[in-house]
């Protein structure tokens, strides 16, 4: 049953990957317990929803990146925190950075696309994050430029997850040593702001936008 016509792409990314892991761990049963079948259907829909002219894909095929939301103008830009190359790599090979790396290996179709999406996302991390602070925006153009819509061109709540996604991709696949450069960069920035008290919202060049100290951001930085 459809609950909402405007899903955020990252939810489906986690659903598909969790189902692939369930299939590998417990095997496949009947109906909704055929985990691999359910995962493959999600992957196919994410990339081919628009094939019949009735919808919008969750991934932009030209740029090989997740859209912010598959509806209207929200499908014309991305969200760096939705980029999960470690998943895409697995999707490309599973027929086995980190989600896309998974999809590149485990999907039954579009494997080359998912492998290319992993590389596109790794490059996007470099393009979207500040070279001095390591901070990235909530929303971004496909070029990596900040998308300042509703103040989401700054480092706010979505952007907390970027560092964790970069770290997870490197932990799983170690495809790009730039990940360690970024980790050192962003952790040094927050350490200098007061490791026990740094604020939770910033401009990309390091101006504090909120004094609130959030355990969620601390957890992402610890990853």
Q: Residue ranges of each PLM-predicted region?
A:
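Extended ligand-binding clefts on enzyme/binding-domain cores
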Residues: 6-10, 33-220
């Amino acid at each position: 049953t459809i609950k909402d016509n405007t899903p955020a792409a990252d939810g489906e990314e986690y659903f598909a990957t969790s189902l692939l892991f369930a299939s590998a761990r417990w095997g496949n049963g009947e109906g909704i317990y055929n985990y691999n079948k359910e995962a493959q259907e999600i992957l196919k829909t994410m990339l081919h929803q628009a094939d019949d002219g009735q919808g919008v894909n969750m991934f932009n095929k030209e740029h090989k990146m997740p859209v912010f939301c598959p509806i209207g103008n929200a499908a014309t830009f991305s969200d760096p925190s939705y980029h999960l190359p470690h998943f895409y790599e697995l999707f490309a090979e599973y027929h086995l950075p980190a989600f896309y790396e998974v999809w590149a290996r485990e999907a039954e179709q579009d494997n080359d696309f998912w492998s290319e999406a992993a590389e596109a996302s790794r490059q996007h991390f470099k393009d979207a994050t500040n070279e001095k602070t390591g901070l990235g925006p909530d929303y971004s153009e496909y070029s990596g430029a900040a998308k300042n819509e509703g103040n989401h061109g700054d480092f706010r709540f979505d952007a907390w997850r970027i560092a964790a996604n970069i770290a997870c991709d490197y932990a799983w696949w170690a495809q790009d040593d730039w990940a360690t450069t970024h980790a050192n960069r962003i952790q040094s920035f927050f350490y200098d702001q007061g490791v026990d008290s740094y604020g939770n919202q910033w401009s990309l060049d390091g101006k504090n936008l909120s004094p609130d100290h959030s355990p969620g951001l601390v957890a992402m930085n610890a990853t």
